[in-house]
C-alpha cells in the first residue's frame, strides 16, 4: 500500500514539474515574440519619422496586445532605440461600461464615429489645447491610415485622466474611456514639455 502511495506521489510530482517547465517555455517564447515585435516596430517607426520629416528624437508606441493593467505606452528614444519611459494607458470601452475594464484583454477597435472604440494605426500628434480631463491639456491626433482616418471627426485626442493610475493594476485593467489614449496626470506632465517644444510633428503609433 505504501509503495502504491509513493508511486502515485512521485507521479503527481512529475506531472507538476512538467506543467511548470511547459509554462516557463511558453513564457520564454512569448517574451521572444514580444521582443521581435518591438524591434520590428522600432525599425519601422525610425524609417517613418525620417522619411516624413517627423521628430527624430522620440516617438510614442502603444501596444494594445498588452493587458490594459500593465504598462503598454512607451516613449521610444529614436537615437538609442531604447524605451525610456513606460506608462499605463486607457483604450475605448466600445459597447461596454465607460470607466470599466471589461475589455482589458481584448479591446474592440473601430474607426466609426460614436463607436467609443480606439483606432489602430499611426497618428500625427497635432496642436496643444484645453481639455476637460486631467491636467486640462490635450493634443489633437490626426489619423494617417485607413484604420484611423476619422480621428479628427471623432475628436480623438491625447490627454490625461484622473482615473488612470501611475502603477500597474494587473490583473485588473485600466479604466476605459471613449476611444482617446489617456494616461495618468503625472505621466502626462512628464511628456507635455517634450511635445510642446518639439519643432517637428511627433509620431504616435497604436498597434497590437
Sequence positions of predicted segments:
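N-terminal Sec-pathway targeting helices
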Residues: 1-16
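Cell wall/extracellular polymer interaction/catalysis modules
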Residues: 23-178, 185-202, 208
Amino acid at each position: 500500500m505504501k509503495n502504491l502511495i509513493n508511486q502515485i506521489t512521485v507521479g503527481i510530482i512529475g506531472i507538476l514539474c512538467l506543467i511548470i517547465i511547459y509554462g516557463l517555455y511558453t513564457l520564454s517564447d512569448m517574451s521572444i515574440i514580444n521582443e521581435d515585435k518591438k524591434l520590428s516596430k522600432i525599425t519601422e517607426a525610425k524609417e517613418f519619422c525620417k522619411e516624413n520629416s517627423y521628430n527624430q528624437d522620440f516617438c510614442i508606441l502603444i501596444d494594445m496586445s498588452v493587458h490594459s493593467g500593465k504598462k503598454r505606452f512607451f516613449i521610444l528614444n529614436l537615437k538609442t532605440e531604447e524605451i525610456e519611459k513606460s506608462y499605463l494607458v486607457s483604450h475605448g470601452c466600445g459597447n461596454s461600461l465607460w470607466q470599466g475594464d471589461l475589455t482589458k484583454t481584448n479591446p474592440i477597435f473601430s474607426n466609426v464615429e460614436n463607436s467609443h472604440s480606439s483606432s489602430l494605426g499611426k497618428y500625427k500628434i497635432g496642436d496643444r489645447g484645453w481639455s476637460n480631463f486631467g491636467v486640462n491639456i490635450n493634443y489633437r491626433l490626426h489619423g494617417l491610415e485607413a484604420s484611423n482616418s476619422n480621428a479628427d471627426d471623432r475628436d480623438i485626442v491625447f490627454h490625461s485622466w484622473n482615473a488612470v493610475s501611475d502603477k500597474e493594476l494587473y490583473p485588473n485593467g485600466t479604466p476605459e474611456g471613449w476611444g482617446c489614449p489617456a494616461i495618468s496626470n503625472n505621466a502626462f506632465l512628464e511628456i507635455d514639455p517634450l511635445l510642446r517644444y518639439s519643432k517637428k510633428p511627433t509620431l504616435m503609433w497604436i498597434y497590437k
